[in-house]
């Protein structure tokens, strides 16, 4: 039986009886690299300002598998993440747009989400497109301002 790969993360699923004497190496890559990238991976990516495509290679370390991606380089472009074959890639992304212009994060052929310059955002790939993972933020309650000191009149000339 041949190995296959998981739908969302491209993790190798060894077939019964496969890789005699080598299963440990595959398991170590799956657990120590691929799953770790998916749930705690942090990487930086240098954007070109055009269309940049992040990949998720089956059974190997890949930028698009990381949970947190800091986008550096030239803003104003598009970052495309895998959304279809070989990986449906339904997963969360924490994105930090560390450029001076907005960047659109999307799946090829879709609209995606525009991430403003210097913004940090949580996005979700639903297998078809990138969407905002958060649609509710409770309102913040701010304390009333308190002014102290002596009042000063500004802008009035005394003759």
What are these regions (language model features)?
Residues 1-2, 107, 138, 143:
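Intrinsically disordered, low-complexity segments enriched in Ser/Pro/Gly/Ala and basic residues
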Residues 2-103, 146-156:
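Exposed extracellular interaction/assembly regions and N-terminal maturation sites
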Residues 31-40, 101-109, 124-136:
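Short, surface-exposed terminal/edge motifs of secreted or surface/virion proteins that either
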Residues 94, 122-124:
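Residues within well-ordered beta-strands of beta-sheet-rich folds
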Residues 110-114:
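Surface-exposed loop/edge segments in extracytoplasmic proteins
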Residues 117-120:
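Tight coil/turn sites that cap or link beta-strands
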Residues 129, 136-158:
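Low-complexity, small-hydrophobic/phenylalanine-enriched stretches
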């Amino acid at each position: 039986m041949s190995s296959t790969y998981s739908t969302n993360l491209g993790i190798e699923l060894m077939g019964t009886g496969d890789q005699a004497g080598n299963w440990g190496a595959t398991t170590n890559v799956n657990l120590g690299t691929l799953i770790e990238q998916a749930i705690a991976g942090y990487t930086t990516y240098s954007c070109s300002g055009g269309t940049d495509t992040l990949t998720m290679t089956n059974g190997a370390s890949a930028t698009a598998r990381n949970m947190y991606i800091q986008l550096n380089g030239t803003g104003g472009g598009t970052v495309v993440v895998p959304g279809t074959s070989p990986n449906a890639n339904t997963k969360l992304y924490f994105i930090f747009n560390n450029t001076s212009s907005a960047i659109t994060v999307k799946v090829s052929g879709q609209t995606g989400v525009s991430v403003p310059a210097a913004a940090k955002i949580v996005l979700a790939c639903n297998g078809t497109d990138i969407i905002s993972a958060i649609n509710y933020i409770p309102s913040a309650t701010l304390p009333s301002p308190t002014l102290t000191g002596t009042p000063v009149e500004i802008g009035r000339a005394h003759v």
